[in-house]
Design a protein with these regions (language model features):
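Short solvent-exposed loop/turn micro-motifs enriched in small/polar/acidic residues
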Residues: 25-28, 434, 447
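Active-site mouth of glycoside hydrolases
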Residues: 22, 27-242
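Extracellular glycoside hydrolase catalytic/binding regions
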Residues: 165, 172, 178-316, 321-333
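Sec-dependent signal peptide recognition
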Residues: 1-7
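A short, sequence-level motif marking secondary-structure junctions
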Residues: 46-50, 410-411, 434-436
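Hydrophobic h-region of N-terminal signal peptides that target proteins for export
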Residues: 8-17
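Aromatic- and carboxylate-lined catalytic core of secreted/periplasmic carbohydrate-active enzymes
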Residues: 19, 263, 271-274, 287-431, ...
Length: 464
């Protein structure tokens, strides 16, 4: 049976076009960042487009990808076997991924544009042509969990090898998991087999990670797993920085501190327009400020990049489609929500400074008395990052509250300080000060619920 399945799959694995070839991605030798194969920094700015393959037609997919490319996204996260009944509800062209939903053999027909996988090929090609990598989930977690499981280790290995061969030359990252906890040895056997199949199929061309359930990280389940190249977290859909150590954003920091090191990022943070903590009647829906806080909290705690999400876009919600958890608008209307634009601008900030030597720096923030003021708690948590060679430091102030910073981490006697406005991507109020000792800073909107980033650059760097 295994050989028969494998023969069918490998014969059908025609391979996606290599047009728009992107450089391969690799882990930086020091273990905390990703880079391209020629050694350039890679900033992961992802978008959760979970239902992209399943729900959009080609024209809609191009519209979506054009928008994300314009805003500076470098990754879109999409699922081959989608959560929202992806094995029984066809895609926009009436095609299903498998001929039999209980038998995971891809349904492939000869000729172009004749099956589900031709549509996936098209979207992957169009993403790559726009400089966007696809973080491809072979399956949502629903399809390897308990009652809905359709895989055995043998069929998972065959499916993985087929996918690996088909997308070997494409610009992508494999994402295992799919929003579910890894709880049993049987589940682990399926995922191990799927990963091994992917590796055989693509020859090790692509990195692999694991998208966990809410509030967890891949390190919780796969901390020492040899096929995990970098860790992914789902810090989830609440808007606070928890006081409990090791939870959510502190979990990002804990993952950064693991040895041997592996890069870490938040692959599913709080979404824009999402019910806060899944409680819309009590807590309402998130706004762009909530999205910015998650971005800077994760990045300043050691993440190598970040994923954006919008509650209408992950499900590709449109009129006439059943809504999941009260989306506020259609996916088309959500494309230009402020949070997505603001994170695209913030990406430029991180790429404008030395990249591979940036480290978390909670120690440079001088705690107040009481510490609940600074570094603070809840939505008002201050965080910091710095260059380990003293070229720069940054402090994220989520509110207009004065705070103190120890600038002895800066390598030159004088430094340039300025405020970065995360709403506009602009800097203001730049000045030169002495680096030595502790300095107090007052954000431009003191006393207001507006966030700012303090920028500190060594005098030798002096960016315009």
């Amino acid at each position: 049976m295994t050989r028969a399945i494998l023969a069918v799959l490998l014969c059908a694995s025609l391979g996606a076009s290599a047009e728009g070839v992107l450089p391969r991605l690799a882990v930086h030798p020091e273990g905390h960042y990703l880079m391209t194969e020629d050694g350039k920094p890679f900033f992961w700015l992802g978008d959760t487009a979970w239902e992209l393959f399943h729900r959009l037609n080609r024209e809609e997919a191009v519209r979506y990808l054009d928008n994300r490319a314009k805003l500076g996204f470098t990754v879109v996260q999409a699922v081959c076997l989608a959560e929202l009944d992806g094995l029984s509800v066809p895609n926009a062209y009436g095609h299903l991924p498998f001929g039999n939903p209980k038998d995971p053999v891809p349904a492939v027909r000869e000729g172009a544009d004749n099956d589900y996988w031709d549509h996936v090929d098209f979207i992957v090609r169009e993403a790559n042509r726009r400089g966007i990598y696809v973080a491809m989930l072979p399956t949502w977690g629903r399809w390897w969990k308990k009652a809905d499981n359709v895989f055995t280790p043998d069929s998972a290995a065959a499916y993985g090898e087929w996918l690996g061969r088909r997308y070997r030359e494409s610009g992508l990252v494999w994402v295992m998991g799919g929003d579910r906890p890894l709880e049993t040895s049987a589940e682990r056997a399926v995922l191990d087999a799927l990963a091994a199949g992917l590796r055989r199929g693509d020859g090790g061309a692509h990195l692999i990670t694991f998208h966990p359930n809410g509030g967890a990280g891949s390190s919780q389940y796969l901390g020492d797993c040899p096929w995990i190249d970098f860790h992914m977290r789902q810090n989830g859909h609440d808007i606070d920085y928890p006081a409990d150590p090791g939870v959510r954003y502190d979990g990002t920091l804990a993952d950064w501190r693991r040895t041997p090191p592996k890069p870490v990022l938040d692959g599913e943070p709080v979404y824009e327009g999402h019910p806060v903590a899944f409680q819309p009647d009590r807590l309402g829906h998130t706004v762009a400020a909530d999205i910015r806080r998650a971005f800077f909290w994760d990045l300043f705690n050691g993440a190598f990049g970040h994923t954006y999400g919008h509650h209408s876009i992950w499900q590709m919600y449109d009129k006439g489609r059943g809504p999941v958890n009260r989306p506020l608008m259609t996916w088309k209307e959500a494309l230009d929500e402020p949070g997505s634009r603001q994170l695209g601008l913030a990406k430029r900030l991180f790429l404008s400074r030395p990249f591979f030597t940036r480290v978390p720096a909670p120690e440079i923030i001088v705690p107040s008395d009481p510490a609940s003021l600074v570094p603070g708690t809840g939505t008002r948590r201050f965080t910091a990052t710095r260059d380990r060679e003293g070229a720069f430091a940054m402090v994220y102030a989520p509110v207009g509250r004065r705070f103190k910073v120890d600038l002895s981490c800066i390598r030159t006697p004088r430094c340039r300080v300025a405020w970065y406005d995360p709403r506009t991507g602009e800097e203001r109020d730049a000045r030169i000060i002495e680096s030595a000792g502790v300095h107090e800073f007052v954000p431009p909107s003191e006393g207001e619920l507006l966030d700012w980033v303090l920028l500190v650059d060594a005098e030798a760097l002096l960016l315009p």
